[in-house]
Amino acid sequence: MLKLLLGDPNARKLKKYQPSVTEINLLEEEIKVLSDEELKGKTAEFKQRLAKGEALDDLLPEAYAVVREAGRRVLGLRHFDVQLLGGIILHVGQIAEMKTGEGKTLVATLPSYLNALTGKGVHVITVNDYLARRDAEWMGQVHRFLGLSVGLIQSSMTPSERQKNYDCDITYVTNSEVGFDYLRDNMATSMADVVQRPFNYCVIDEVDSILIDEARTPLIISGQVERPTEKYLQAAEIAFTLKKDEHYDVDEKARNVLLTDEGFAEAENLLGVTDLFDPEDPWAHFVFNAIKAKELFLKDVNYIVRNGEVVIVDEFTGRVLPGRRWSDGLHQAIEAKEHEEIQPETQTLATITYQNLFLLYPKLGGMTGTAKTEEPEFEKIYKLEVAVIPTNRDRRREDLSDMVFKTEAGKWGAIARECAEMHELGRPVLVGTTSVEKSELLSRLLKQLEIPHELLNARPENVEREAEIVAQAGRKGAVTIATNMAGRGTDIILGGNSEYMARLKLREYFMPRIVMPEDEDSFGVQRPAGLPTGHGGGQGFVPGKKVKTWRASPEIFPTQLTKETEKLLKDAVEIAVREYGDRSLPELEAEDKVAVAAEKAPIDDPVILKLREAYNRVKQEYEQFTTREHDEVVGIGGLHVIGTERHESRRIDNQLRGRAGRQGDPGTTRFFLSLEDNLLRIFGGDRVAGLMNAFQVEEDMPIESGMLTRSLEGAQKKVETYYYDIRKQVFEYDEVMNNQRRAIYAERRRVLEGQDLKEQVIKYAEKTMDDIVDYYINIDLPSEEWELEKLVEKVKEFVYLLADLQPNQLEDMTVGEIKAFLHEQVRIAYDLKEAQIDQVQPGLMRQAERFFILQRIDTLWREHLQQMDALRESVGLRGYGQKDPLIEYKSEGYELFLDMMVNIRRDVVYSLFMFQPQPQQMMQASSEMV
C-alpha cells in the first residue's frame, strides 16, 4: 500500500539519475565524429578541468560518453542505457544489482575511468586471479586506448611488480591480494618495500560474495611456531575411540563440539593425565580439534587430499584454496586424521577482515546479480545503498516449483532421470552441487544411464578445463555438473561460444611454437586451457613436471576447419615465429598476444593483425554451426538449471538460477531437495522430522506440500539471520581491533616515513621517566616519604649512563621539577649515547632507532593479537554473569592496548640505551637493517 502511495523507492532513486543518462545520449553524436586522437585527447582535457576546480560529477556526462564511444571502437561493445545507469550508481558509491549477462564487467569501465582522472588510483576488485586478468586485458583496452595506465596484480608477482601495478591509474586485483598487500605493507621495514598507495576508490565485482560470504573469514598473515606433532597424533587416536552422543555432543549449527563428563573421564584415562586443562601439559585444545576434524570437517566436502597435502575447498565457490590453512591447530588435526605429514602450526602476525579492509576506502561501489535480499546488511555495516538496475531485455526464465523427496537417494535418482530426459530433448542442463563428493555421486549415476556429461569441481584435473567446460555448457544436449557456480566468470551461451572456440584453436597452433620451453614446465602447473586469457589463478597443480600441449579436447570444436582457413592460421603463426623468434616468449606474454588478436582494439602491429585475420576466419566458420545450434536450443526451451540443495542463503540459490535465461533467452530452473539435506536437518528441526514420518511415500516419489515449502523458506531465513548475526558479531568485535590496528599502523607508518626519529625516541624516554616518577611518588604523602632511592634505581636500570644520579639531588624538588630535571638528564644521556654509537659508524644511531621501534611494534603487536584472541574466547562466558561480553571486550581490550603502547615505549628506550655495537658486527648488522 505504502509503495503505491509513495512510489517504489528504487524507481525514485533511478529517476533521479535519468537526466544524466539523457545528457550522455545527447552527447553521443558529437563524440562519435571525433578522430581516435581527439578522443584520446579528452583525457588530458578532463584532467585540466579537474585541476581548475571542476568536480568529478560535472565531468560525468561527457566522460561517460567518451568511455561509451571508446568501448564501441575498441571492443565493439556500446554501453546500453541501463549500463550507464549502473555506472552512475557505482560512481556515487552505491551497489548496483544487475542480472547475470547484463554486462557488469563493461559497466565498471565508466566509474573507474572517471575516478582515475584524479590520479589517485582506482582498484577494480574481482573474486579470482583469472577474472582480474581477463578484465584487465579485455576492459583494460578501453582505458589504455584513452591514455590511462592499467595495472594487474596476480598472486605470483614480486613486490617490485606489485608496486609498478598499484601505481597505475586503474589496477585490477582480487580481494585477497589487496588485503594481503595491505597487511604486508604494514609489516614492511622500509618505505621502499611498501607497494600500495593510499586507498581512493574501488569497484567490487560480485560485491555480495566478497562483503558478505567472505566477511566471516579474516585475512591472516602468519609465522611458524613449533608444536609437538605427537600430541596431534595421539589426540586423533583418542577422537577415533570416543563415541558421539556418549562421550561428546556435536553442535552442527555452531560448528562446535562439547565433551560430556564421561568423555572427559575417558579422554583423561586414555591419555593417562588427571586434567585435560592442566596449563603445564594442556591437552583439551588438541582433543577438541581432533573431534572437530572427525565430525565437522569431511573429506571431499570441506577439503581434498592432494599429493599428501590437505587442501581447503572454498564452501562458497567450490574451488580449492592452495596455500590457505585453517588456524588454531585445526589443519594439523585434520592432517593427523588423514595420516598425512603434520605441518608446523602458525602464529598470527597481522590480520584484518574484509569488512574493515573495504571500509578503509573513502568511496566504494559494487556490482552483483543478487544484493537486494541482503540490503539491510549492506546499509548497516557498510553504509551502502542498493539500487536495482532494470534488465536491457525482458526476462524469459521460468522458475519451477521445488521437488522434495523423502531420502537423499530418492532425490539423486530423480535428478539423474531429469538430466536424461533433458538430454533426450537436446536441452542443455547445468546441475549445481554443493560438494566434490556429491558431484561425483551424480556423475556415477549418469555414467550408469550412459549420459555423456562434464564434471567441474575442485579436483585439479577438472579445474584446468574450467572455462572450456562452462563455455560449452550451452551446447545442444550438454550436461554439466558444477560445484557452486557462484562467480564463475565465463558466460553460458546457448549453442556454444564461437569466439571462445576460435581463440582455443588459435592457441593450439600459436602457443607450442612461441612459448619458451623452460617457461611451460617450470611450474609443474598446467594452466587451464584457453580461459579467455588462459590464466586460472594457479588453481590446478599437476604432480611432477609435465610438458604442455595446449591441445583442447577435439569434441569442443563443432566442425573441421577448411583447408584455406587452416593454411591462413599456419601462415599467421609462421609470421609470428619469424618476428618473435622460435619458442622465445614467456607464457603470459604469449597469452597476451592471443588475447589482443582475439579482440577488436585498433592496433598497428602487423603480426597481430595477421593473427587477428586468421582468428576471425576461424570464428566465422564455427559461427555457422553455433548460430544454427543457438536457434535450435532456444526453440526447445533454452538452458535448464538444476539446484540439488538449498544453500545457506537464498542469494546463492538465485545466483545459480541466474545462469538460465540470460539476455532475454528462454530457460527454466528447478531445485531438487530431500528431507535429509543439511539445511533442513540442521535448521528445519523436529517439525520436518515429524512431517517425514507423516508422509508414507516411496523414496523416489516427490512430495509437494505448502507446509513443507514454508518450512523450507523458514529454515533458509533462519540460516540467513543466524549467519548475519555471526557476521555482525565478527564486525562488532573486529571494530575494536580495527581502531587499534589503525592506530598502530599509523604510528608504524610515521616511523617508516620519518627521516629523523630522534625526537620521537626522546619523547618515549621522557614519557618513560614520567611513568617511573608517577609510580614511585605518591603525591598524597609528604615529600620526605617519597621513595626516591627506588625511583633513582629504576631510572638507572633504563639509562645506565645516568649512573652518577643520586637521590639527594631530587630531595627539594616538586614532582613537576623532578620530571623536568629527568627530562633534561635523559636528553643529555641520549646525546652521549648517540656520540658513542656514531663513532662506530656515522649515522648508525638513526638506523638503530628505526630498527628498534619497528621491531618492538611488530613483536608486541603480535603478542597483543594473541592476547586479544584469548580475551575474546574468555569474555564469551561472562554473558552468564549478566555482563555484556562486547562491552567487557571493548574495555579490557582498550586496557591491553594501552599497556602495549607503554611497553613499546619502554622497550625501545631500554634497547637503545643498552645497544652496544661491535665495529665488525656492526657493518653486518647495519646491512641487515637497511
UniProtKB/Swiss-Prot annotation:
Residues annotated as binding ATP: Q83, G101, E102, G103, K104, T105, D491
Pfam families: P-loop_SecA, SecA_DEAD, SecA_PP_bind, SecA_SW
Gene Ontology molecular function, alphabetical: ATP binding; protein-exporting ATPase activity
SUPFAM superfamilies: Helical scaffold and wing domains of SecA, P-loop containing nucleoside triphosphate hydrolases, Pre-protein crosslinking domain of SecA
Compartment list: Cell inner membrane; Cellular thylakoid membrane; Cytoplasm
Listed GO biological process terms: intracellular protein transmembrane transport; protein import; protein targeting; protein transport by the Sec complex
Alphabetical UniProt keywords: ATP-binding, Cell inner membrane, Cell membrane, Cytoplasm, Membrane, Nucleotide-binding, Protein transport, Thylakoid, Translocase, Translocation, Transport
EC identifiers of the protein: 7.4.2.8
UniProt main location, coarse: membrane
Presence of keyword Transport: yes
Function: Part of the Sec protein translocase complex. Interacts with the SecYEG preprotein conducting channel. Has a central role in coupling the hydrolysis of ATP to the transfer of proteins into and across the cell membrane, serving as an ATP-driven molecular motor driving the stepwise translocation of polypeptide chains across the membrane.
Subunit structure: Monomer and homodimer. Part of the essential Sec protein translocation apparatus which comprises SecA, SecYEG and auxiliary proteins SecDF. Other proteins may also be involved.
HAMAP family: SecA
PANTHER family: CHLOROPLAST PROTEIN-TRANSPORTING ATPASE, SECA INNER MEMBRANE COMPONENT OF SEC PROTEIN SECRETION SYSTEM
Protein name in UniProt: Protein translocase subunit SecA
Gene: secA
